[in-house]
């Protein structure tokens, strides 16, 4: 009897310790997701009913398809530029250049600063009367006028790169630091020059780190909200489109917004599934000390 009570009391204690986390999970994640799914199939403005019209309306609308394409353009473009920036920067910082600790700290700054504050700062920097255009018009002779960066697709990609490239940079630096230097030395002894060691040894071995950072950057950029909301102008990706459907009409189009949210989630899950399948099939190799 004592052992029975002791065994079940431990289970009860474990359950009560997990109960707050379970309540938070069901209340803050599971229930809202379930409600979103239900609303996405409910006719707009009705309490009951079932329809695919919310999905069909958005996907059949050229503006809806453009929003999806724009979201992919911003996410893919910012991911590519983040990789192009992160790999050389990681290689430089790996060499322990003077002040490398400070530079590593600066890499993490975009992760610390809230996206809204960062976007406002970038709007001021790239603005018509911002420091960037002030420098161009004052010191670059062939520039006759300010360049328009804000409220453009190119400007949004620049904003995304500044905010999200630390994901790629941190994972790439981590892969480089875990790389066994003996492998590079063996390549050099075999007659390979520095470029060949980098091209045929280092880059293939750090590919998993680059891919991991890339998927983090892509997912963050794909779901970005605050930055395109204030810096996107007429360019509205999926997250902003969802907000527009809820906030601008009175009453809000909750069913349409829920359908767009489900489409957005399905695209993210689909991309993540393709990425995981690519990794399982040997999309990258790694080496560690």
Residue ranges, per PLM feature:
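Short, Lys/Arg-rich, polar N-terminal cytosolic tail immediately upstream
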Residues: 1-9
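Membrane-water interface segments at the C-terminal ends of transmembrane alpha-helices
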Residues: 10-44, 62-146, 151-152, 156-176, ...
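Glycine-rich helix-loop "coupling/hinge" segments at transmembrane-helix boundaries
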Residues: 43-47, 225-252
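Glycine/proline-centered hinge or cleavage motifs at structural transition points of membrane proteins
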Residues: 190-191, 204
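Short cytosolic juxtamembrane segments of multi-pass membrane proteins
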Residues: 278-289
């Amino acid at each position: 009897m004592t052992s029975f009570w002791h065994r079940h009391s431990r289970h009860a204690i474990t359950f009560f310790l997990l109960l707050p986390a379970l309540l938070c999970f069901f209340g803050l994640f599971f229930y809202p997701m379930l409600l979103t799914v239900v609303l996405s199939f409910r006719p707009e403005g009705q309490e009951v009913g079932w329809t695919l019209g919310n999905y069909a309306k958005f996907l059949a609308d050229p503006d809806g398809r453009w929003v999806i394409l724009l979201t992919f353009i911003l996410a893919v473009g910012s991911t590519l530029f983040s990789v192009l920036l992160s790999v050389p920067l990681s290689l430089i910082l790996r060499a322990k250049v003077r002040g490398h600790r400070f530079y590593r700290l600066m890499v993490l700054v975009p992760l610390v600063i809230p996206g809204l504050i960062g976007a406002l700062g970038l709007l001021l920097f790239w603005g018509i009367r911002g420091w960037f255009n002030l420098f161009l018009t004052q010191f670059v002779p062939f520039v006759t006028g300010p360049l328009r960066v804000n409220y453009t697709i190119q400007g949004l990609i620049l904003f995304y790169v500044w905010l999200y490239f630390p994901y790629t940079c941190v994972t790439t630096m981590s892969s480089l630091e875990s790389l066994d230097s003996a492998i590079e030395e063996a390549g050099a002894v075999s007659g390979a020059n520095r470029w060949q060691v980098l091209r045929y040894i280092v880059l293939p071995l750090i590919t998993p780190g680059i891919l991991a950072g890339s998927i983090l950057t892509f997912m963050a950029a794909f779901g970005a909200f605050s930055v395109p909301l204030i810096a996107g102008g007429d360019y509205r990706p999926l997250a902003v489109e969802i907000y527009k459907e809820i906030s601008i009409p009175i009453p809000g189009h909750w069913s349409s917004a829920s359908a767009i949210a489900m489409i957005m989630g399905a695209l993210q899950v689909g991309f993540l599934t393709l990425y995981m399948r690519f990794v399982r099939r040997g999309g990258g190799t790694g080496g560690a000390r």
